[in-house]
């Protein structure tokens, strides 16, 4: 079965509509990425950045600043069947002595990524849904009810963007700024943040999970 995505022709980056690169760098001022280093290797003429070797995923480093500032004890997020965010949050709540509740779409068999979240101690709530926005509402309503902190889908939060820009520059080091960057695009947090970190690079995105709206794909 072939799937088609609706992708906007708008090339704006919603993170830069009212804020600048300097704003995000200032927001993360003093924060240092202490997560395990990614593998940044040359492969067939390309430079590959691999965060999977850390066991955290990219959001495991980018989400650190946000979770470090969360006052609530319980963190609430929506974990799809495939995705590293729940695993990343599992590590971060352990680091900052918090609890994690994950709302997951129910199916006949739990996915590998969801299972890892369970193994890492996340409290799970499975719901049968027609679309992810419905599950997001369940999760947000639950967070409001228990006084927890609801993390937007994809960790779409300015502190995550700020840490993402700072972390990328810290880990990239003194390498020349890349001319071309190829990235998957789901919520677009990764791609939009990298565009801020590397303002002169040309970006090529591969949509993998959802329709993309104005402001989400950037340049």
Model-derived regions, located:
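Short internal alpha-helix immediately C-terminal to a glycine-rich phosphate-binding loop
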Residues: 60-76, 86, 167-177
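A short, small-residue-rich loop immediately preceding and capping a beta-strand
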Residues: 72-92, 96-104, 180-187
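Cofactor-binding loop segments of dinucleotide-utilizing enzymes, especially the Rossmann-like FAD-
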Residues: 80, 105-107, 206-210
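Glycine-rich phosphate/pyrophosphate-binding loop at beta-loop-alpha junctions
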Residues: 159-219
């Amino acid at each position: 079965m072939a799937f088609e995505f609706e992708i906007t022709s708008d090339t704006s980056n919603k993170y830069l509509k009212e804020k600048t690169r300097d704003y995000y760098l200032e927001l993360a001022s003093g924060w240092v990425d202490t997560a395990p280093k990614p593998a940044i290797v040359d492969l067939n003429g390309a430079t590959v950045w691999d965060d999977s070797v850390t066991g955290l995923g990219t959001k495991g480093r980018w989400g650190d600043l946000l979770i470090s500032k969360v006052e609530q004890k319980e963190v609430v997020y929506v974990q799809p069947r495939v995705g590293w965010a729940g695993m990343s949050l599992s590590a971060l709540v352990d680091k900052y002595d918090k609890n994690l509740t994950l709302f997951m779409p129910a199916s006949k068999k739990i996915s590998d990524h969801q299972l890892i979240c369970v193994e890492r101690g996340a409290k799970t709530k499975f719901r049968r849904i027609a679309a992810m926005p419905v599950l997001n509402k369940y999760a947000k309503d639950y967070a409001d009810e228990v006084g927890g902190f609801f993390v937007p889908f994809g960790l779409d939060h300015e502190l995550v963007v700020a840490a993402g820009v700072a972390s990328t520059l810290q880990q990239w080091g003194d390498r020349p700024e890349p001319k071309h960057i190829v990235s998957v695009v789901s919520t677009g947090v990764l791609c939009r943040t990298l565009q801020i970190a590397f303002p002169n690079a040309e970006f090529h995105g591969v949509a993998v999970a959802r329709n993309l709206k104005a402001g989400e794909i950037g340049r």
